[in-house]
Amino acid sequence: MALKWTSVLLLIHLGCYFSSGSCGKVLVWTGEYSHWMNMKTILKELVQRGHEVTVLASSASILFDPNDAFTLKLEVYPTSLTKTEFENIIMQQVKRWSDIQKDSFWLYFSQEQEILWEFHDIFRNFCKDVVSNKKVMKKLQESRFDIIFADAFFPCGELLAALLNIPFVYSLCFTPGYTIERHSGGLIFPPSYIPVVMSKLSDQMTFMERVKNMIYVLYFDFWFQMCDMKKWDQFYSEVLGRPTTLFETMGKADIWLMRNSWSFQFPHPFLPNIDFVGGLHCKPAKPLPKEMEEFVQSSGENGVVVFSLGSVISNMTAERANVIATALAKIPQKVLWRFDGNKPDALGLNTRLYKWIPQNDLLGLPKTRAFITHGGANGIYEAIYHGIPMVGIPLFWDQPDNIAHMKAKGAAVRLDFHTMSSTDLLNALKTVINDPSYKENVMKLSIIQHDQPVKPLHRAVFWIEFVMCHKGAKHLRVAARDLTWFQYHSLDVIGFLLACVATVIFVVTKFCLFCFWKFARKGKKGKRD
């Protein structure tokens, strides 16, 4: 009997080792809202595969639920902000962000820059609170983690990895102008045919659009390297006790798990330590709550429209709400609208308001005809996954770009939240519902998203386990990160070759002049003789 139980335990241990790269200890550094929701999907899978996952969260963290259904360890470090203060700051900045006038490039990005710097100041203080807390750092060192899984948008995970001397893997959607991806990850984004994020361009650019794209690249490079990065560089140098930069420290990431997909992104060059895992949170629809299911079924052949502007937009003016409600009341479809505000006066009988909706499950229904969205990445991927055409009403950040991508692929119509009329919204809905090309185009994207040899979630987990198993993945990191900008573009080599050519031309010219002078001199002597 003892031998039998020993054999069972051995098989369990070997199963864990071979199926999950040996059960390891994962330390997680994450952000809030959609950032956390994406990482949580991966963490659930890691826990199911036997790994021990510890989330490092500030005392002000908003969304982390210690009573979540899956087993996570939570390491809370104290910070000066309370949850209420932190949430109020986020909501105030989001409102300010969505209200910025987008007509002027310089005005829009200067105000956006201020907002981002304020967020960076908050997260830099969070990072300081962690690394300066001797009790927390001692506990982390004694825990002997195998890997850090961090969101690259919120710096600090790489600093913790350096202090704990362990490898780290990034999760990232994007950074403005792809600045960190290019300078730290070595990812190649030729501005001649790859539009940088936040430019709202497609890969089919005119000459002036390519000029605009280059201006965006230069602007974001200047923004990051000349301004905000200085504070991070100084902070990291002080903590590590040697001169360093944020870009250099982030460049040591073993794997970059980009929350992107070729069904969404425009084609561009790739690197071996970068993988696209966009849409990893998407899954088949689950049954709806009874009341919601009855409302959906009552739509008959006309079907339903799903409407959500995301989790961080909690209110809108009565005027805007009534503009939207008026348009929705005129369509034959039933509408499920995620709305946490006062009931609009113009709300039609075909529209129901919900403070929360199971968005993925609604988009997966055969009766769903269209999705009105703000263009958040998670919602976009759910719409692609289930093949639902979109009406995009982007508000801020990457949302205009996301909708621009879908519009370029013929899967969406775009409207402006601040200027659209009821007629505009009504016509947009009629277009995506009644024009079959929108459904056909988004179904093509859906097929591409589904037709992958390994699903995005499984690839993400594989790479985390791979790094744990091999103690890193340095063999996949390109040497470009070790080069200066002029070495990367071979300007020193070009300069050297030009100097060589110039030297040869100079020597040959001098030699020819010397020969000419010699022969001319001999000719004069011959005439005299």
UniProtKB/Swiss-Prot annotation:
One of its GO terms (cellular component) is endoplasmic reticulum. Its EC number is 2.4.1.17. The keyword Aminoacyl-tRNA synthetase does not apply. It is a single-pass membrane protein. GO terms for molecular function: glucuronosyltransferase activity. Glycans are attached at N315. Expressed in the liver, breast and kidney. SUPFAM superfamilies: UDP-Glycosyltransferase/glycogen phosphorylase. One of its GO terms (biological process) is estrogen metabolic process. Keywords: Cytoplasm, Endoplasmic reticulum, Glycoprotein, Glycosyltransferase, Membrane, Signal, Transferase, Transmembrane, Transmembrane helix. It is found in: Endoplasmic reticulum membrane; Cytoplasm, Perinuclear region. The modification N6-succinyllysine is found at K135. Residues 1-24 form the signal peptide. It catalyses: glucuronate acceptor + UDP-alpha-D-glucuronate = acceptor beta-D-glucuronoside + UDP + H(+). Belongs to the UDP-glycosyltransferase family. This is UDP-glucuronosyltransferase 2B28. It comes from Homo sapiens (Human). The gene is UGT2B28.
